[in-house]
Regions:
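ER/Golgi luminal nucleotide-sugar-dependent glycosyltransferases, focusing on the catalytic module
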Residues: 1-254
Length: 254
């Protein structure tokens, strides 16, 4: 099959040259800067020519940013504005605070031509960094399995780790199934947190973005598809993360 990928780099304030300075023009063409929060001043590299402002999309809903869905809200907007991804075979979600290393995009394309069902990730974290009990993981996965009508096996994430921080690229059908789930169930997920269902808030004050991160990670490792690590660095320490103040699941893992 002919592979057509795009990495959407989600940012509310900046995307610097250093994030993409090692990429060729052909690789840069596989990136789109996706900006949120209209009122926040932006510092965006000119190296990435493609840009989407979420607030200008035909369908847009600021509630997803207001409720701290962040990059997961962008997933919903990519799903509902289908023209944005209709020609793609694979969808990537990145933060602004990454560094694409040399050949990091082309290597993904080369791998996908051999196995288009591969899921690419930046980091797999162990259960000790979940801030959830095994019971709570199982209940979240039961909820997802019912709503998505597909098995999400919490024991896989518990035993082998979970793909974290959203940083990933997946086949479009994998992406769309999760984005559809968020679109249809985000209010109930908020209710799970608000009402401390299954005592899910007892370990730390989880925020929407953190729970969605974990649910995305549980879902991906349950797909029984090949997993391969991206050659992309998460450059967390070079940035101030103001949205992580009053920490929820914005736990900085060492």
């Amino acid at each position: 099959m002919e592979v057509n990928i795009n990495f959407f780099l989600i940012t509310y304030n900046m995307l610097l040259d250093k994030a993409v300075q090692h990429l060729t023009p052909e690789e840069l063409d596989k990136l789109t800067c996706y900006t949120v929060q209209k009122k926040v001043p932006k510092q965006i590299t000119t190296k990435v020519a493609k840009r989407i402002n979420e607030w200008e999309l035909p369908w847009n809903d600021y509630f997803y940013q207001k409720s701290q869905c962040y990059e997961y809200g962008a997933m919903v907007h990519l799903y509902t504005n289908k023209e944005l991804i209709e020609k793609l075979t694979h969808v990537g979600i990145m933060h602004y605070d990454v560094i694409f290393n040399t050949n990091s995009v082309q290597s993904v394309i080369s791998e996908l031509t051999k196995n288009p069902d591969t899921i690419f990730y930046q980091m797999i974290r162990p259960k000790e960094q979940l801030s959830l009990s095994k019971y709570e993981v199982s209940k979240l996965c039961e909820f997802m399995s019912e709503k998505m009508e597909t098995e999400v096996d919490g024991s896989i994430a518990w035993d082998n780790g979970w793909i974290s921080e959203a940083l990933s690229l997946t086949p479009k059908y994998v992406f769309e199934k999760y984005a559809k789930f968020l679109y249809e169930n985000h209010l109930e997920i908020l209710d799970i947190l608000k009402n401390n269902r299954w005592n899910i808030m007892n370990h730390c004050p989880h925020r929407m973005c953190g729970i969605l991160e974990r649910m995305w990670g549980f879902y991906l490792v349950s797909r029984n598809l090949p997993l391969k690590q991206l050659d992309i660095t998460h450059d967390w320490d070079s940035y101030q993360h103001k949205h992580m103040d009053s920490n929820g699941t914005g736990i900085k893992f060492l």
